[in-house]
Regions:
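Alpha-helix capping and helix-loop boundary segments enriched in small/acidic/polar residues
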Residues: 1-2, 245-249, 262, 288-291
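Signature of N6-adenine DNA methyltransferases within the class I
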Residues: 1-127, 210-214, 222-225, 247-255
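Non-catalytic, well-ordered alpha-helical scaffold segments
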Residues: 5, 138, 189, 225-230, ...
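Basic, amphipathic alpha-helical recognition segments used for DNA target recognition
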Residues: 183, 195-257, 264-268, 272, ...
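Short, well-ordered beta-strand micro-motif
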Residues: 12-14, 145, 191-194, 216-218, ...
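Short, well-ordered loop/turn and helix-capping segments at boundaries between secondary-structure elements
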Residues: 13-19, 234-238, 260, 277-280, ...
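Non-catalytic DNA-recognition/assembly elements of restriction-modification systems
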Residues: 71-95, 119-120, 262-309
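Segments forming glycine/polar-rich beta-alpha architectures that bind adenosine-containing cofactors
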Residues: 67-207
Length: 309
């Protein structure tokens, strides 16, 4: 069985209660560029990396996951006392039950919008009420959905979800819809696309409903929102996420497991100042400036996480 969008395969394993199986060697190869390389794993290849683990060591990992890095780093990751899930609520978002009926795009140029209706601009409202827009027959609010081309802040609102009171009442009762984690709708948080890319692009959410294709991160200490936004855009977190989760998705559970390091006061102030600068920039025209400030943040996080790098 394979999944075309992510080039994954399913391997069936046989369970064995014999203690001797714990001495099995498990080899994991990464870095494949072509399908043909699958048949050449015994040959020397510049692309391929091989990690070898005892089955007994894998059983010691949290949730028995494969952590693809050297053993010293595995110990540090497994022994992390504080994780993202300890300092933030990490949740998935809303599902209408029928996106083609209830979700609209700003224009046909939006990625993935070909089969969606275009929103009527006269029916867009600034409503942040969980019970819906009152006294209108049909109304829409801005909706965070899918990936972002930019870090820190999205270029524009590309998607809208129907949010008049009658429709919200329908979502709550409908068996197909998922009005899940609704206490976080319209709150200030961080959006990370569920589908993994080479580089995480985390963006700030304010006064928005967010889709189930988004993992929302909501720091428990409100003064850490900018710090967490910068952290999730860092090379360190991008690397760690790929280490602990080599699959195609950034699920909420994997993000919760990421090691968290508490910043000192000066470090927090510096990161906050840098993020304020970025948020004041134009995400379309100031790309190089944003990347330069983000690189300053990267250097700070590299020091904070230097024992794992």
């Amino acid at each position: 069985m394979n999944f075309g969008y992510s080039n994954l395969s399913i391997i069936t394993l046989e369970k064995d209660d014999c203690e001797s199986v714990k001495d099995n060697d498990v080899k994991i190869f990464t870095g494949f560029k072509t399908v043909r390389e699958l048949g050449r794993i015994d040959e020397n290849s510049e692309n391929l990396q091989c990690f070898c683990y005892k089955q007994s060591d894998i059983l010691k990992n949290e949730n028995y996951k494969f952590i693809i890095t050297d053993n010293s780093k595995i110990a540090i990751i497994n022994d992390s006392k504080v994780r993202i899930g300890d300092v933030a609520d990490v949740v998935t978002g809303f599902y209408s039950g029928n996106n083609k009926e209830f979700i609209c795009a700003k224009s046909k140029e939006i990625k993935g919008a070909q089969n969606y209706r275009m929103v009527d601009c006269d029916k867009i409202y600034d409503c942040y009420d969980l019970t819906g827009i009152k006294n209108v027959a049909e109304g829409y609010v801005a909706y965070v959905k899918g990936s972002s081309d930019t870090r820190y802040i999205r270029k524009e609102d590309e998607w809208y979800v129907r949010w008049d009171k009658e429709t919200v009442d329908f979502y709550i009762k409908d068996k197909k819809a998922r009005f899940q984690n609704s206490k976080f709708y319209f709150k200030t948080g961080i959006a990370i696309p569920m589908v993994k890319s080479k580089q995480i692009k985390a963006t700030l959410m304010r006064n928005r409903v967010f889709d189930q294709s988004i993992v929302g991160i909501f720091p428990k200490e409100k003064n850490k929102i900018y710090y967490m936004l910068a952290l999730m855009n860092s090379n360190v977190i991008n690397k760690l996420l790929h280490i602990i989760n080599p699959t195609a998705n950034n699920s909420a559970n994997y993000i919760k497991q990421l090691p968290y390091r508490e910043p000192g006061y000066e470090m927090l102030m510096k990161i906050n100042s840098n993020v304020v600068k970025i948020l004041d920039m134009n995400p379309e025209t100031d790309i190089d400036k944003i990347e330069a400030v983000n690189e300053e943040n990267n250097k700070i996080f590299d020091l904070l996480y230097q024992d794992i790098l």
